[in-house]
Amino acid sequence: MKAKHIVVYLLLAIVSSSCIREEALNAEADILSCILPGVAMTTSPIINNNSITIFVGPGTDISELKPEFTLTPGAAISPLSGTERNFNTPQEYTVTAADGVWKKMYTVSVIDTELATNYNFEDTLGGKKYYIFVEREGDKVVMEWASGNAGYAMTGVAKTADDYPTFQITDGKAGKCLSLVTRSTGFFGQIAGMPIAAGNLFIGSFDVNNAMSNPLKATKFGLPFRHVPTYLAGYYKYKAGDQFTEGGKPVNGKRDICDIYAIMYETCESVPTLDGTNAFT
């Protein structure tokens, strides 16, 4: 009888302790937003997983900027938000989660030049699991091209950078070039209802957090442009796929196509950028 009492008491103690256990501290270490007090930004900063790109007008003094950051609840940043730094070169920040364990490194760049207008797709960022194409002025990266590669990484299909839909090859008209292909998304894509992923590259940013829930909204098209466009010219080769599919099923009598286009648009407060849902409206 005593043994039964002991078991009951132990169970009650376990239940009681579980009820009063403190909630675990936040393990997220993200920068959610960024501002430059006293400095006009030409568009909203592009915040990716480990990098932030801030755009200011040409001629802006970027040697003494004091960016301020909004972080996930409880997180801390080093150097402190509002610290004056010289952004003539990219600056590193470390965000530590509220639990004190998880950390994330961010590289923050400030671009004070006009948008590049000549592209050769020779340059990419090194040390990445997939190709990120960039434009440079001297040693400085002035623009990162966006693509859906970050979303494709979630499928787990690609083993090397060349297995992604958007990658670099060596047989361009002169030197290296961009290659876009359609890839299978494997089992992950099948259960998500997105069996294939087309290669793409665009000026803007890709929101990987929306890649699965709303892929069209994940594409944020465009950066500020202050010139009058006259033409779009370049070199390309294209080969249609062997079998056109829709929803994972073959469709006879149809062939896929390649799109290359430039869209110029004016922004407003309610529509700061176009995306895959309204780019052509």
Regions found by a protein language model. Give the residues of each.
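Short carbohydrate-recognition loop motifs
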Residues: 168-188
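Extracellular carbohydrate-recognition regions
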Residues: 111-153
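Bacterial Sec-dependent N-terminal signal peptides
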Residues: 1-30
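Beta-rich interaction/scaffold domains
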Residues: 19-119
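Secreted extracellular polysaccharide-interacting domains
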Residues: 181-224
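Short helix-loop boundary/capping segments
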Residues: 231, 235-281
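Short, exposed beta-strand/loop patches in secreted or surface proteins that constitute
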Residues: 40-47, 69, 158-172
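Beta-strand-rich interaction surfaces with strong enrichment in secreted/lumenal proteins
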Residues: 82-83, 219-223, 281
